[in-house]
UniProtKB/Swiss-Prot annotation:
Residues 989-1018, 1154-1176, 1406-1438 form a coiled coil. GO terms for cellular component: eukaryotic translation initiation factor 4F complex; intracellular membraneless organelle; synapse. Residues 1-35, 128-326, 454-615, 681-706, 724-744, 855-875, 1009-1037, 1067-1214 are annotated as: Disordered. The gene is Eif4g3. This is Eukaryotic translation initiation factor 4 gamma 3. It comes from Mus musculus.
Length: 1579
C-alpha cells in the first residue's frame, strides 16, 4: 500500500466502501494511494458522538433512525437525505458512487467507536437512501460449507442473502459508494479483530495475508480509515444452514415473526489487530462480488454512526464485526479469511429470522436469546495465517455467522470508525475451534490459499500486532461475539444496531485512551445485558474474564500515531470524559487523536483463559475495573432482599458532561424515541444533554443510573384506540332516521327553536318572534318539543324569564291536532301549563331520590365513597332548588301576562306556604316578589294578610335558617312598602340601558372630580374671615352643619328651636334681614322641603324687606335651582347686589315655585344619581309625606294673592334644561303621565317649555324605541291638554331638526327615531298632518332631507293604521310630494323606492272613505257574516278587511265586537231538524280572530257574551246550546272566568232580554266552574 499520509482528521471515521484502486503493498497500512480523501472520513469540524449506554434501539449513522421489524423503507430515512460527497475512483470501478458515512451532516450522527461491541437493544432503523445496485466484480470465490449439513456447500446461499441497511436491493455495493450499507473486504476499516484468550499474543492480525484481485485492489484504495473499526465490518459469512434460512426465511422476518436473537458465542474470542494489506483476500473478493442477503433478507439497519457498510459481507467484515475492538486501522492487515463452513455451527434459520424480526422485541427477550445462542452456536472460524507468528497455531473464529443488525437488536456494537485504509479481515480466534477439527482444517485451507497473496506486514501492522497482543484476550468476548452475530445476517455494520446513542462528538475531547473507549463501550453493553436473565450470566462471567488485565501503552501510542493518518478523533461520550479527565495520563497524553481501533483485552500469562474451563479464575485490579460496567456488574439480580444499605437498586450515575455541546446535535431519547420526540425522562442536565452517560465515572461513585425500560415500537402495528360506546357525533354523521322525513323536519325545527332561544333578548325580541311565527309546528310531538325547549330554557335562566314568558304569550294561540284523537286539538297554553304543573309537583319525586341517596350515603363506609355520595347529594339538591326557583319565577311571569288565573297562583302560594322546608319557602319568596303586587288588591287582601301572618310566624319561630328568615322578612317589608323594591330587578339590559348607565357613571366620576377641585381653590367673591373662627364640618352626603354661634350678625335674643340653620335655611329664610330666620310655623310648613345644595346661603347679604324675596316661602321654591353641583355653590356663594345683571334668578319667585318644589320632592323618591345631584338626596327629604305636601300647597295657594305673577320666567334656560332632564328621567322610569304633566305645568311658569321639548327629544333620541314611544305620547298629552303649545312643540323639534343631517353621521337611524317621537301626535290627532309636516319640513328642505323624514313617519303610521287610512290622511291634508323633495328628483321614482305610492293612488274622496268606515252594527254584521259564513275567508283576509275598513277605535268598539262574535257563533251553529249543536271546529278555527280583538280584556269579553246571549235569544234559546258555547269558549280560553262571572252578575238593563233563561241553562256550567276553583284552592 502506498505510504502517502492522509490529511489528519480529528475524528474517527466509519468504515466505508472505497473505490477499488491499485494498491501497492506497503508497510504502512494506514496510508493508501489515492487522490481523494475517503468519503467516509469526517472533516475536522465535525463532531463524533459516542452513543449513550442507553439501550437505544438504533445505530446512529445519520441521526436517529428506527429499525422496526417488518418495516421496509424504500424512501429516505427519518432524519433526511444525507449529503453525498462525490468520490471518483481513480481506476475503473464497477460500483456506483453513493453516500458514505462521512457524507452526511454531522448533526445527524457521528461515528461509533468500535473499541468494544455494545449489546444493542432492538434497533429501530429507518433505512438510508437507496443505493444503485453495484456491478459485480470478479473475485475469487470462497466456498463455505456447513458442518451441520454434512459439509454442504452453502456459499451461494450466503452470498445471495446479503442485506443492506439501505432500502436498495442488497446487490454488491460499489467500492466508491461511501454509504454504510455494505463493506467490501478490502474496504473494511481496520476492524480490530477480537482475539480470544486462546492466543495470548495478538499478532494474528499482523501476519494475516490479504489477497485480492488486482482490479479489486485498484478499486479499493480508500485512504486510511479512522482508528476505530466499525463493527459493521463483521464478516458476513453465513454457513449453509444459515444461508438457506436467510434466503428462505428472511421474508418471514419481514412478516414479523420475532424470534429470539442468537446469543453471543459462549466461548470468548478475541481478534488480534490484523495488519492491513493492500491486497484483499480472494475470499474478500468473492464475497464482495456477491451480496450475502437478498433484498428480502435485509432488515434495513443503518447505523447512525456508520454509513458505509459494504453490501457484500466479507471475511474482513465478519472479523471486524466480531471484533470491533479499538485497534488501529493501520495495524490491521487486509488479509483474506477463509471461512470453513464446518468450522462453526451455523445459527439456525429460525433463530436468524427471529433475530431479524426481534428488532422490535424488548431487550430482555433478545438478550435471553443471545445467551442461548452463545451456548448453541459454534463460531464460524476463519483460518488466517499470521506472518509475524506463523509458528503459532491460531484458530480463527468468525463468531456465529454475522447476523443482520436487525437480527441483533440486543447488541449495541461499538461505534464504527470509517476506514481510511483497506481493512484487513479481522480474525476471530476462539476455543471453539479446538472443539471442531473441521474448523481447523478449513482455517488451514483458507490460510494456504492466501499464502500467495500475503504481503509483508507494514510497520503499522506490526505495531498493531503488539498492541493487539495486550488487548485481544480481554476484548474477545466483548467484541467478537456481538460483531460476529451482527455480521452474519446483513452487510449492514453491526454497530448500526447500537443500543444507546453514543454521546455527541466534541472537538475538545479528541484524546481518548483505548481504556476509556473500552469502558465507554462496555457500559452500554452492561446496560443492555441488565435485562438478560440467568441464561446469560455464565456468558457474562466469561466475558468479564475476557477483559484485559493490562494494556500496552505502546499500542495506544501507535494507535494515536495512526490517527494522524486521517483518522478521526475519538468521540467524547457523556460520562466517558470522566475517564479521560480522571485518568489524565491515559486519556489526554499523546496526540490529540487517541486510537482505540484494535484495543483488545489480552489475558496475562498467569491469568485464567476462556479456553481453560477448569482453571482457577484470578483477576487483577485493572481487569476488574474494566468490567465494572458489564451487565452482570451493574444489574441487580432478581430475588435479592431489598436492603438499601447492602444491595443497591441501581449503579452510580456518572456526572453529566459540562462541556458545551454542538447545537446541531439533537438529544437522544430513551428506548426507541427519536431525537425530535419529547422525552419525559429528561436528565437534570437540561436540554441538549443526552439522558444517561455512557462512560463510567469512577470519580463520582455516589451517582446512580436509573434502570431503563425497553419499549418496543412497531410502525406497521395498528394501534387500536378504545372507542366510547356513546361517543358524540356531529349531527351530519349521526345515524338519524334518514328514512323518516318527518323526523328530520322535527329535528330541524327543534334546532331552529334552540337557535332562536339562545339569541332571545329584550332587544331582539320582535325580530326573533317573527322567526318563531314562521316556523311550522303542526304536530303534537313538535309542539311538545317546542314547549319543552322554551320551558327548560326559562327555568335555567330565571333572569330572562320575562322574555320567555312574552314569547309564550305570543304563541298562546298555537294549536295542533292531537295524535291519539285526530278530531281534537291541543293548544300551546294547555301543554305549557301542564308542563309547569308537572315541574311544580316534582318535589315529591325529588324527595324520593334524595332519600335514596341519603340512605346510600349512610350505608357507605369508605371516607372517599361517603365524600363522593355527599357531593352528589348536595349537587342534586342544588340543581333541584335552582329548577324550582326558575319554575316559580316563570309561572309568576306567565301570570302577569294573564296566561294563568289568580286561583292558580293562590293555590301555588298555599302549597308553598304549607311546606316549611327551605326550598318551598325560598320559592314562596320568589313568587311573591314577582306577583305580589298583582295579587294584593283590595278584594284579595284578606287572603294576602293570612299569607303574611303565617310568614311572620315562621320568621319569629326561628326554626329555619337565617337566610330564609331574611328572605321572608324582605318580602314582608316589600309589602309594607307597597311592593316598591329598594333596588331595581337586575334583569337583562338593553344596549341603551348599558350605555346610559355607563354615561351616568362617567358623569358621577366627573362630578366627584369637580367637587375635589372646588374644595382646593378659594371661591372668588366670598369674604372669609379667619378671625371669626368659621368651623365647617363635612357631614354625611355632602351636608354641612354650620355652627350658629359663629354667625356674628345673628343677634336675635330668642331663637326658635325649630329654626333650621342647616342647609334647609336658605335665601328666603334670611330675606327678612338679620331677624334670625323663619318662624316655627313657617319651619313646620317647610320641614318637608329639601335642603338646598347652596349650603352657604346664610352668608348672602340681606335682601330689602320690601322685595318679593322677603316671603318665607320663596327660598323653597328655588331650592333645587340654586345649586347645580359645584358650580351652583360657587354662584350662590357670591353676594348678589341689588343691581345685579340677573336679579330675577334669586330675588323673584311665585307661588308656583312652591308647587314646583313639592313636585321635586316626589321626583326624588326614585331619582337616579343625576336627580340626586339636584336635590341633595337627603333621606329626611325622601321621607316627606303627602300630607306635608298638601299642607304646603294650601299654604302656597293662600299666598298667591299676595305674590304677584312674575313678568319673566324665574329660571334660566340652562336651569330649565336641568330640571327638564330630571322630570323626563323620572317619567321614563315610572311612566306616570299625571305626575309628569303636573311637573311640566309647574315648570311652564318658570321657563320656556320649548327647552323641555328639546331636552326630551335629545334625551330619548338614542334610547330604546319604547322610551321614544312614551315620550311621544307624553308630548301628545301635553299638547292635547294645552299644557304645551304647538309653537313650543315645533320650536323644540326645530333645533334638533336643523342639526339632524350632521347628527346622522353618529346616529344613522335618526330619521326613524324622530318619526317615532312624532307618530303618536299624528296617530292620536293632536296636530294635523299638514301642519306638522309643513313645520317639520322647514329646517330640512335646505338639506334635502324632508322627504326622508316624511317617509319614515308615514311608514310608522302604516304599521299602526292601514295604508288606506294613511293615504287618505295625506290626501286630505292636500300635501304634494313636490313640495318636500329636492328639485329635480323624480317623485314617482321616490315613491316607488320608498313604497309610498299609496299616498298618490286615486280613490274615493276622503269624506266618502270616512263615511264608508262609519258602518252601522247591521252593516258590520252583514259584511262579517258574508266573509265568515259565505266566503269562509281565512283569518288573514278578515284581518285585512277590518284594517282597511275600520280604525282602531272602531275595532275596539262594542258594535264591532258584537258583530264579530255574532258572525262566528252563527257560523258554528249546526241545525238538525229541531235541535241545534255547536260545531267546535269552527270556533277553534276562528279563535285567533276572537283572541286578537278581544285582547284578553274582560270588558270586551263581556260584550262578546252579550252578543252570544242575543244570538241564542233570537233562536228561542235551544236547549244546551248556550252551555255548549260556554264550554267551548272556556276550553279554548277565549273567555276568561272573570268575564263569565261578570256576565252572570251583570244587571245591565239593556242586556236583560232572555237573561234569566240563559242563566238557568248554564247553571251547571257555573257550578262546575266554582267547584273547580274551590278544588284548586283546597289543593
Amino acid at each position: 500500500m502506498n505510504s502517502q499520509p492522509q490529511a489528519r482528521s480529528p475524528f474517527f471515521q466509519r468504515p466505508q466502501i472505497q473505490p477499488p484502486r491499485a494498491a501497492i503493498p506497503n508497510s504502512s497500512p494506514s496510508i493508501r494511494p489515492g487522490v481523494q480523501t475517503p468519503t467516509a472520513v469526517y472533516q475536522a469540524n465535525q463532531h463524533i458522538m459516542m452513543v449513550n449506554h442507553l439501550p437505544m434501539p438504533y445505530p446512529v449513522t445519520q441521526g436517529h433512525q428506527y429499525c422496526i421489524p417488518q418495516y421496509r423503507h424504500s424512501g429516505p430515512p427519518y432524519v433526511g437525505p444525507p449529503q453525498q460527497y462525490p468520490v471518483q475512483p481513480p481506476g475503473p470501478g464497477p460500483f456506483y458512487p453513493g453516500p458514505g458515512p462521512g457524507d452526511f451532516a454531522n448533526a445527524y450522527g457521528t461515528p461509533f467507536y468500535p473499541s468494544q461491541p455494545v449489546y444493542q437493544s432492538a434497533p429501530i432503523i429507518v433505512p438510508t437512501q437507496q443505493q444503485p445496485p453495484p456491478a459485480k466484480r470478479e473475485k475469487k470465490t470462497i466456498r463455505i460449507r456447513d458442518p451441520n449439513q454434512g459439509g454442504k456447500d452453502i456459499t451461494e446461499e450466503i452470498m445471495s442473502g446479503g442485506g443492506s441497511r439501505n432500502p436498495t436491493p442488497p446487490i454488491g455495493r460499489p467500492a466508491s459508494t461511501p454509504t454504510p450499507p455494505q463493506q467490501l473486504p478490502s474496504q473494511v476499516p481496520e476492524h480490530s479483530p477480537v482475539v480470544y484468550g486462546t492466543v495470548e499474543s495478538a499478532h494474528l492480525a499482523a501476519s494475516t495475508p490479504v489477497t485480492a484481485a488486482s482490479d479489486q485492489k485498484q478499486e479499493e484504495k480508500p485512504k486510511p480509515d479512522p482508528v476505530f473499526q466499525s463493527p459493521s465490518t463483521v464478516l458476513r459469512l453465513v454457513l449453509s444452514g444459515e444461508k438457506k434460512e436467510q434466503a428462505g426465511q428472511m421474508p418471514e422476518t419481514a412478516a414479523g415473526e420475532p424470534t429470539p436473537e442468537p446469543p453471543r458465542t459462549s466461548s470468548p474470542t478475541s481478534l488480534p489487530p490484523l495488519a492491513r494489506s493492500s491486497l484483499p483476500s480472494p475470499m474478500s473478493a468473492a464475497l464482495s462480488s456477491q451480496p450475502l442477503f437478498t433484498a428480502e433478507d435485509k432488515c434495513e439497519l443503518p447505523s447512525s454512526k456508520e454509513e458505509d457498510a459494504p453490501p457484500v459481507p466479507s471475511p474482513t467484515s465478519c472479523t471486524a464485526a466480531s471484533g470491533p475492538s479499538l485497534t488501529d486501522n493501520s495495524d490491521i492487515c487486509k488479509k483474506p479469511c477463509s471461512v470453513a463452513p464446518h468450522d462453526s455451527q451455523l445459527i439456525s434459520s429460525t433463530i436468524l429470522i427471529n433475530e431479524m424480526n426481534g428488532v422490535g422485541e424488548k431487550l430482555s427477550a433478545k438478550e435471553n436469546t443471545v445467551g442461548m445462542l452463545r451456548q448453541e452456536v459454534l463460531p464460524l472460524t476463519l483460518e488466517l495465517e499470521i506472518l509475524e507468528h506463523p509458528q503459532e497455531e491460531l484458530k480463527v473464529e468468525c463468531t456465529p455467522t454475522p447476523i443482520a443488525p436487525s437480527m441483533l437488536p440486543a447488541f449495541s456494537p461499538a461505534p464504527p470508525t470509517p476506514p481510511t485504509s483497506p481493512p484487513c479481515p479481522p480474525v476471530v480466534l476462539s476455543a471453539a475451534i479446538a472443539r471442531s477439527p473441521a474448523v481447523a482444517t478449513e482455517v488451514q485451507r483458507v490460510a494456504d490459499e492466501g499464502e500467495s497473496l500475503r504481503t509483508c506486514l507494514s510497520k503499522d501492522a506490526k505495531e498493531m500486532q503488539d498492541k493487539a497482543e495486550s488487548e485481544s484476550d480481554g476484548q474477545a468476548e466483548e467484541t467478537a461475539d456481538p460483531q460476529s452475530l451482527h455480521s452474519g445476517r446483513s452487510p449492514a455494520p453491526v454497530q448500526t444496531a447500537t443500543t444507546a446513542p453514543k454521546s455527541w462528538k466534541k472537538t475538545k475531547e479528541q484524546t481518548r485512551t483505548p481504556d476509556e473507549v473500552l469502558e465507554a463501550e462496555a457500559e452500554p453493553k452492561a446496560e443492555e445485558e441488565l435485562a438478560v436473565d440467568s441464561v446469560l450470566e455464565p456468558e457474562q462471567e466469561k466475558m468479564s474474564q475476557g477483559f484485559p488485565s493490562e494494556r500496552d501503552p505502546s499500542a495506544l501510542k501507535r494507535g494515536k500515531a495512526e490517527e494522524g493518518n486521517g483518522e478521526e478523533a475519538e468521540p467524547v461520550r457523556n460520562g466517558a470524559e470522566s475517564a479521560s479527565e480522571g485518568e489524565g495520563g491515559d486519556g489526554n497524553s499523546g496526540s490529540a487523536d487517541s486510537s482505540a481501533d484494535g484495543l483488545t483485552f489480552p489475558f496475562k500469562a498467569e491469568s485464567w483463559k476462556p479456553a481453560d474451563t477448569e482453571g482457577k479464575k484470578q483477576y487483577d485490579r485493572e481487569f476488574l475495573l474494566d468490567i465494572q460496567f458489564m451487565p452482570a456488574c451493574i444489574q441487580k439480580p432478581e430475588g435479592l432482599p431489598p436492603i438499601s444499605d447492602v444491595v443497591l437498586d441501581k449503579i452510580n450515575q456518572p456526572r453529566l458532561s459540562m462541556r458545551t455541546l454542538d447545537p446541531r446535535i439533537l438529544p437522544r431519547g430513551p428506548d426507541f424515541t427519536p431525537a425530535f420526540a419529547d422525552f419525559p425522562r429528561q436528565t437534570p442536565g437540561g436540554r441538549g444533554v443526552p439522558l444517561l452517560n455512557v462512560g463510567p465515572r469512577r470519580s463520582q461513585p455516589g451517582q446512580r443510573r436509573e434502570p431503563r425500560k425497553i419499549i418496543t415500537v412497531s410502525v406497521k402495528e395498528d394501534v387500536h384506540l378504545r372507542k366510547a360506546e356513546n361517543a358524540w357525533k356531529p349531527s351530519q354523521k349521526r345515524d338519524s332516521h334518514a328514512d323518516d322525513p318527518e323526523s328530520i323536519k322535527t329535528q330541524e325545527l327543534f334546532r331552529k327553536v334552540r337557535s332562536i332561544l339562545n339569541k332571545l333578548t329584550p332587544q331582539m325580541f320582535n325580530q326573533l318572534m317573527k322567526q318563531v311565527s314562521a316556523l311550522t309546528v303542526d304536530t303534537e310531538e313538535r309542539l311538545k318539543g317546542v314547549i319543552d325547549l322554551v320551558f327548560e330554557k326559562a327555568i335555567d335562566e330565571p333572569s330572562f324569564s320575562v322574555a320567555y314568558a312574552n314569547m309564550c304569550r305570543c304563541l298562546v294561540t298555537l294549536k295542533v291536532p292531537m295524535a291519539d284523537k285526530p278530531g281534537n286539538t291541543v293548544n300551546f297554553r294547555k301543554l305549557l301549563l301542564n308542563r309547569c304543573q308537572k315541574e311544580f309537583e316534582k318535589d315529591k319525586a325529588d324527595d324520593d331520590v334524595f332519600e335514596k341517596k341519603q340512605k346510600e350515603l349512610e350505608a357507605a363506609s369508605a371516607p372517599e365513597e361517603r365524600t363522593r355520595l355527599h357531593d352528589e347529594l348536595e349537587e342534586a339538591k342544588d340543581k333541584a332548588r335552582r329548577r324550582s326557583i326558575g319554575n316559580i319565577k316563570f309561572i309568576g311571569e306567565l301570570f302577569k301576562l294573564k296566561m294563568l288565573t289568580e286561583a292558580i297562583m293562590h293555590d301555588c302560594v298555599v302549597k308553598l306556604l304549607k311546606n316549611h322546608d327551605e326550598e318551598s319557602l325560598e320559592c314562596l319568596c320568589r313568587l311573591l316578589t314577582t306577583i305580589g303586587k298583582d295579587l294584593d288588591f283590595e278584594k284579595a287582601k284578606p287572603r294576602m294578610d293570612q299569607y303574611f301572618n303565617q310568614m311572620e310566624k315562621i320568621v319569629k319561630e326561628r326554626k329555619t335558617s337565617s337566610r330564609i328568615r331574611f328572605m321572608l322578612q324582605d318580602v314582608i317589608d316589600l309589602r309594607l312598602c307597597n311592593w316598591v323594591s329598594r333596588r331595581a330587578d337586575q334583569g337583562p339590559k338593553t344596549i341603551e340601558q348599558i350605555h346610559k348607565e355607563a354615561k351616568i357613571e362617567e358623569q358621577e366620576e366627573q362630578r366627584k372630580v369637580q367637587q375635589l377641585m372646588t374644595k382646593e381653590k378659594r371661591r372668588p367673591g366670598v369674604q372669609r374671615v379667619d378671625e371669626g373662627g368659621w368651623n365647617t364640618v363635612q357631614g354625611a352626603k355632602n351636608s354641612r352643619v354650620l355652627d350658629p354661634s359663629k354667625f356674628l350678625k345673628i343677634t336675635k335674643p330668642t331663637i326658635d328651636e325649630k329654626i333650621q340653620l342647616v342647609p334647609k335655611a336658605q335665601l328666603g329664610s334670611w330675606g327678612k334681614g338679620s331677624s334670625g330666620g323663619a318662624k316655627a310655623s313657617e319651619s313646620d310648613a317647610l320641614r318637608s322641603s329639601a335642603s338646598s345644595l347652596n349650603r352657604f346661603s346664610p352668608l348672602q347679604p340681606p335682601a330689602p324687606s320690601g322685595s318679593p324675596s322677603a316671603t318665607p316661602l320663596e327660598f323653597d321654591s328655588r331650592r333645587a335651582l340654586t345649586s347645580r353641583g359645584s358650580m351652583g355653590r360657587e354662584k350662590s356663594d357670591k353676594p348678589i347686589p341689588a343691581g345685579t345683571a340677573r336679579p330675577n334668578t334669586f330675588l323673584r319667585g311665585s307661588s308656583k315655585d312652591l308647587l314646583d318644589n313639592q313636585s321635586q320632592e316626589e321626583q326624588r323618591r326614585e331619582m337616579l344619581e343625576t336627580v340626586k345631584q339636584l336635590t341633595g338626596g337627603l333621606d329626611a327629604e325622601r321621607a316627606s309625606t303627602e300630607a306635608d305636601r298638601s299642607k304646603t300647597r294650601e299654604l302656597a295657594k293662600s299666598e298667591m294673592c299676595a305674590v304677584p305673577a312674575p313678568d319673566k320666567p324665574a329660571l334660566s334656560e340652562e336651569e330649565v334644561e336641568r330640571k327638564s332632564k330630571s322630570i323626563i328621567d323620572e317619567f321614563l322610569h315610572i311612566n306616570d303621565f299625571k305626575e309628569a304633566t303636573q311637573c311640566i305645568e309647574e315648570l311652564s311658569a318658570q321657563g320656556p317649555l320649548h327647552v323641555f321639548v328639546k331636552v326630551g327629544v335629545e334625551f330619548t333620541l338614542e334610547r330604546s324605541q319604547i322610551t321614544r314611544d312614551h315620550m311621544g305620547h307624553l308630548l301628545y298629552q301635553l299638547v292635547q291638554s294645552e299644557k304645551l303649545s304647538k309653537q313650543d312643540f315645533f320650536k323644540g323639534f326645530s333645533e334638533t331638526l336643523e342639526l339632524a343631517d350632521d347628527m346622522a353621521i353618529d346616529i344613522p337611524h335618526i330619521w326613524l327615531y324622530l318619526a317615532e317621537l312624532v307618530t303618536p301626535m299624528l296617530k292620536e290627532g293632536g296636530i294635523s298632518m299638514r301642519e306638522l309636516i309643513v313645520e317639520f319640513s322647514k329646517p330640512l328642505l335646505p338639506v334635502g332631507r324632508a322627504g326622508v323624514l316624511l317617509s319614515e313617519i308615514l311608514h310608522l303610521l302604516c304599521r299602526q293604521m292601514s295604508h288606506k287610512k294613511v293615504g287618505a290622511l295625506w290626501r286630505e291634508a292636500d300635501l304634494s310630494w313636490k313640495d318636500f323633495l329636492p328639485e329635480g328628483e323624480d317623485v314617482h321614482h321616490f315613491l316607488l323606492e320608498q313604497k309610498l305610492d299609496f299616498t298618490e293612488s286615486e280613490g274615493p274622496c276622503s269624506s266618502e272613505a270616512l263615511s264608508k268606515k262609519e258602518l252601522s252594527a247591521e252593516e258590520l254584521s252583514q259584511r262579517l257574516e258574508k266573509l265568515i259564513m259565505e266566503e269562509k275567508a281565512d283569518d288573514e283576509r278578515i284581518f285585512d278587511w277590518v284594517e282597511a275598513n275600520l280604525d282602531e277605535s272602531q275595532m275596539s268598539s262594542p258594535t264591532f265586537l258584537r258583530a264579530l262574535m255574532t258572525a262566528v257563533c252563527k257560523a258554528a251553529i249546526i241545525a238538525d231538524c229541531s235541535t241545534f249543536r255547536v260545531d267546535t271546529a269552527v270556533i277553534k278555527q276562528r279563535v285567533p280572530i276572537l283572541l286578537k280583538y278581544l285582547d284578553s280584556d274582560t270588558e270586551k269579553e263581556l260584550q262578546a257574551l252579550y252578543a252570544l246571549q242575543a244570538s241564542i235569544v233570537k233562536l228561542d234559546q235551544p236547549a244546551n246550546l248556550l252551555r255548549m258555547f260556554f264550554d267551548c269558549l272556556y276550553d279554548e280560553e277565549v273567555i276568561s272566568e272573570d268575564a263569565f262571572y261578570k256576565w252572570e252578575s251583570s244587571k245591565d238593563p239593556a242586556e236583560q232580554a232572555g237573561k234569566g233563561v240563559a242563566l238557568k241553562s248554564v247553571t251547571a256550567f257555573f257550578t262546575w266552574l266554582r267547584e273547580a276553583e274551590e278544588e284548586s284552592e283546597d289543593n
